[in-house]
């Protein structure tokens, strides 16, 4: 697959198989139950059968840390949801979807961060969780690190 997008995180063509915990999307298992990943998009979800991969690996929830409309110019066209995918596509397949609008390269309040940590903790009681922002690095890593510090202290 050739990446015709401005951002290397929009396609798997920039990554080796060892850099993708799930086939076809930049992703890494941080713990046995928490997957960090780049944002998915509708064509990719279909072509790599992402929902099927979620079911096969036990992922029951997806946490989206993007703001609607974010990074509209570097990847596939945004859906009416304001994201590169329709969250309903996951929910109709019994995968919970949570969205916390957190500005890229921005900060968030301690209250908001604690709310996100609590939701991540709750979601983990249902099964494995995939967390993404745009690239699956900054906000995704901060949330997962905060969860690990808070719950594994």
Located regions from the model:
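A phosphate-binding catalytic loop at a beta-strand-loop-alpha-helix junction
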Residues: 127-149
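Eukaryotic intrinsically disordered, low-complexity, charge-rich
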Residues: 1-12
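Cysteine-based protein phosphatase catalytic domain of the PTP/DSP
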Residues: 13-128, 151-152
């Amino acid at each position: 697959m050739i990446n015709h997008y401005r951002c290397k995180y929009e396609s798997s063509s920039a990554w080796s198989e060892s850099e993708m915990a799930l086939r076809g999307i930049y992703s890494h298992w941080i713990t046995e139950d928490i997957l960090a990943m780049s944002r998915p998009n509708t064509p990719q979800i279909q072509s790599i059968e992402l929902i099927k991969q979620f079911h096969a690996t036990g992922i029951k929830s997806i946490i989206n840390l993007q703001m609607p409309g974010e990074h509209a110019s570097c990847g596939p066209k945004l859906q009416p949801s304001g994201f590169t995918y329709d969250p309903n596509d996951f929910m109709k397949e019994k995968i919970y979807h949570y969205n916390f609008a957190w500005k890229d390269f921005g900060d968030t309040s301690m209250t908001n961060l604690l709310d996100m940590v609590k939701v991540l903790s709750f979601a983990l009681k249902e099964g494995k969780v995939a967390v993404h922002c745009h690239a699956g690095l900054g906000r995704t890593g901060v949330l997962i690190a905060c969860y690990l510090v808070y719950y594994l202290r």
